[in-house]
A protein has these predicted regions:
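Conserved beta-strand signature within the Rossmann-like core of class I S-adenosyl-L-methionine
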Residues: 144-151
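Short alpha-helix
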Residues: 173-191
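Class I SAM-dependent methyltransferase SAM/SAH-binding core
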Residues: 59-107
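A short, conserved alpha-helix within the catalytic core of class I
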Residues: 127-135
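A conserved beta-strand element that flanks and buttresses the S-adenosyl-L-methionine
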Residues: 119
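Conserved class I S-adenosyl-L-methionine
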Residues: 1-47, 50-58
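A C-terminal cap/extension of S-adenosyl-L-methionine-dependent methyltransferases
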Residues: 195-246
Length: 246
């Protein structure tokens, strides 16, 4: 049974996926393209012959790419039935290695110890973190890994933008704060957190394609140097979280 919050999230994402145009802020995502590169590098290295869950798969873009890495099976779930319908059109759902389901990430239908990897992008901050981390822990196999890209809620200018554009986000979303990382550390082991999007976001108008831009390469390297200092971590836009079930 869905909670009131779950219902609001489902309605928000169904409405979002029913629109013909994407959100304006999508233009900013090139500033954290290096997080996506690291995300898929991890999956490229670890997906072969693994059972994988795309947790909040949306319309299936990540899942389609991970299929190239030869998983044993990959399952995508999302609370939005509109998203799953779109995903089935994008991905060959007749492939026996793929399953796409409408499901509640906070209370999935899977058995204990089902997956080698659970991954997602921009999903945890839409959920009750305690509940979903316990659920991920339950469905991961011992030694299984979680992998998530999530926004941070610690940069005051980004938070101001969020307040000025409430219709672009769901009512219940909560970009991650320091206490959320403590929650993760209490539930998983071998945790690695990498930060992205400070200088690359500030100067995003001066470069075009990040993968071809020497300016972007300089900025992302400067970011990684600055993120060694705690105060700059709070100015990052997003993080890549890798952790393991004990």
């Amino acid at each position: 049974m869905l909670s009131e919050k779950n219902i609001r999230e489902k309605e928000f994402h169904n409405k979002l996926q029913s629109k013909s145009k994407g959100r304006f802020e999508n233009i900013f995502y090139k500033a954290i393209s290096n997080s996506s590169n690291d995300f898929f590098d991890f999956l490229r290295t670890n997906s072969n012959n693994s059972e994988i869950l795309d947790y909040g798969c949306g319309i299936g873009h990540s899942l389609k790419k991970v299929l190239e890495f030869n998983p044993k099976k990959i399952t995508g779930i999302d609370i939005s039935d509109v998203s799953i319908q779109k995903a089935k059109k994008i991905i060959n759902n007749s492939d026996s290695t793929v399953e796409l389901l409408v499901d509640n990430c906070e209370k999935t239908k899977f058995n204990n110890n089902s997956f080698d990897i659970v991954y997602g992008t921009g999903i945890l901050h839409h959920l009750n973190l305690e509940i979903c981390l316990d659920e991920i822990n339950r469905i991961l196999k011992p030694g299984g890994k979680l992998l998530f890209i999530e926004p941070l809620g610690t940069n005051p200018l980004i938070n101001l933008y969020r307040k000025l554009s409430p219709n672009s986000r769901s009512k219940d979303e909560h970009p991650l704060l320091g206490r959320d990382f403590e929650t993760i550390k209490n539930k998983f082991v071998k945790i690695d957190i990498k930060y992205y999007g400070f200088l690359t976001l500030i100067f995003f108008p001066i470069y075009s394609s990040p993968n071809k831009s020497s300016i972007f390469r300089i900025l992302k390297n400067l970011d990684q140097f600055l993120f060694k200092i705690n105060i700059f971590k709070k100015l990052a836009w997003s993080v890549l979280i890798v952790a393991e079930k004990n």
